[in-house]
A protein has these predicted regions:
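ATP/adenylate-binding site constellation spanning eukaryotic-like Ser/Thr protein kinases
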Residues: 34
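Catalytic core of pol beta-like nucleotidyltransferases
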Residues: 1-17, 26-31, 40-97
Length: 97
């Protein structure tokens, strides 16, 4: 489901990676743990695109909470912790289409 949303926004995500981080990525998740999803690139994702993706994630039919974070705008300590055990779930280069 989450990967499907990222595919819908592939052109907006060009040049960015989307990662799963937190307890789901590190293997410490409990049954109802949330999904921490981050986006990172050379530049922050344009705010309009960020919120369009967030709205689509919120519309997913799931009982799980999904936290959507622009890691470019996160505190350096959070960004580093997130990326230490992150799993890339979507990636596209600037020139991919």
């Amino acid at each position: 489901m989450i990967i499907g949303v990222m595919r819908q926004f592939a052109s907006q995500l060009r040049g960015h990676k989307v990662v799963l981080f937190g307890s789901r990525a590190s293997g410490r998740a409990r049954t109802l743990s949330d999904f921490d999803i981050g986006v990172i690139g050379e530049q922050p994702l344009p705010i309009r695109d960020f919120y369009a993706i967030e709205d689509s994630l919120e519309d997913l039919p799931t009982l799980y909470r999904i936290d959507w974070v622009d890691l470019n705008k996160a505190a350096p300590s959070l960004r580093q912790r997130a990326l230490d055990h992150a799993e890339v779930i979507h990636e596209s280069s600037v020139d991919s289409g």
